[in-house]
Amino acid sequence: MITDLTFTQLRDKLKNKELSSLQILRAFKDEYEKDLKHPLPLNGFVEFFEDAEEHAKKADELIAQGVSFDEKPLLGLPIAVKDNISMAGKLCTCCSRSLQGYYAPYNATVIDRLLEAGAVLMGRINMDELAMGSSTEFSCYGPSRNPVDRARTPGGSSGGSAAVVAGNQAPFSLGTETGGSVRLPASYCGIYGLKPTYGLFSRYGVVAFSSSLDQVGLFGKEAADIALGLAVMAGKDEKDETSEEADFSSLLKLSAYSKEEIASLKIAIPKEFLNTQGLDQEVKQVFDELCAWLTKNGAKLEEVSIPVLEASIPTYYTLAISEAASNLSRIDGIRFGLRKDTGKGNDELYIQTRSEGFGPEVKRRIITGNYVLSKEFSGDCYEKSLNVRAKIAQGVNEVLQKYDFIICPTAPAPAFKLNEKVDDPIAMYLSDLFTTFVNLARIPSLSVPAGKTKAGLPVGIQFCGKKFSEDRILKLAKAWEEQNA
């Protein structure tokens, strides 16, 4: 079936004129519409764009006219987009009641780059409200479901983006990540998910959660899919001063590491993660099997201690909620989105709009974030967390000066059941136990589907590298993929 093909395979079919863009789009749309009739639909798309077919037809016309894939590397390929990334003239609600009716007036830079490369935008994708959550249960459109087991979460906050790719409703999707929101869903759904180096992709046009941590991320079914998206989206953007120059155009054709190249690698395994009580033994077994494969190919693996990693979760959440409290003050009922005007003045307008517009998890984080930023506690909480973040980054980068990669499980356990942790925020936050250090250190990390539990639940292992080493990470992932297909 067309929908079983990877993003890279579909590109080859388009290049060879074996399939048209319209055929591809309609195949995925049919899967989406068929799933709507399922007793437990995935609920990945919150909107499938009506004009997508028109754009697919235009792509087919360009292909017929001889426009090359060198000029437009993603010509005719459909892509699904998380609902917090601006697409001009389209709703951008972040799956929050507070932003219902808000249409983006411009494109995010990453969207412009995809369109310039010829991609076709399929639709908006479900997410945890304002990107706050680890299960996609905090969405005003209802939860997304995991296509592997529909009683379970696809992860979050980009769970819808992972679900549509794993569920064959889209070949490729964009998510965003602040503390694990791409890698966690990728692990739970059994696909690839990349959190790039901070600054590799522009954040212009992405609704901010935590500005010092947020990054756009990518989902695909194989390593080469991620490489394609990375090649066209990376690089400096004058509209985002945190973006940096980077050229990954060579990744349009991804090659795997040879056995000799793998044999030259030194790889670090953080002891702190392997010795935690929360690590599921079946996840540990999958990790051990991947380590055995690396050792068999000659790589040198060593356990290392980075004690400060144990502070990753509290440090991450302290900083993230503080920045969220500041960033989300703009959603006030005055300029855009929901407006609940009682005629009793602006203070009452703010209170009513935000009380009705925000869900419980967003309220929890905003209230806690404002507490952290208050005059009495900012020194003890926020400023100390900034110092600990710097120590985490220093510790991780010192290891990466001696080793090529850090590897560890993406999540301590496989996907949990829907409603299992929705009323237990601490348990939910601990889903990010192995991911947040990457965001705090601003390094790249790829979640690689590495195996399954006895119950058939996917397990992801993450490959983490130095800043801007995405090409090397993807080469290693492709080698694993080719030898374990």
Curated annotation (Swiss-Prot):
- Residues of the signal sequence? none
Protein biosynthesis as a keyword? yes
Give the InterPro entries listed for this entry: Amidase, Amidase_CS, Amidase_dom, AS_sf, GatA
The record's active-site residues are K82 (charge relay system), S157 (charge relay system), S181 (acyl-ester intermediate)
Task: List where the protein spans the membrane.
Answer: none
GO cellular component terms, A-Z = glutamyl-tRNA(Gln) amidotransferase complex
> What EC number(s) does this enzyme carry?
6.3.5.7
Entry keyword set:
ATP-binding, Ligase, Nucleotide-binding, Protein biosynthesis
Family recorded in the similarity comment: Belongs to the amidase family. GatA subfamily.
> What's this protein's name?
Glutamyl-tRNA(Gln) amidotransferase subunit A
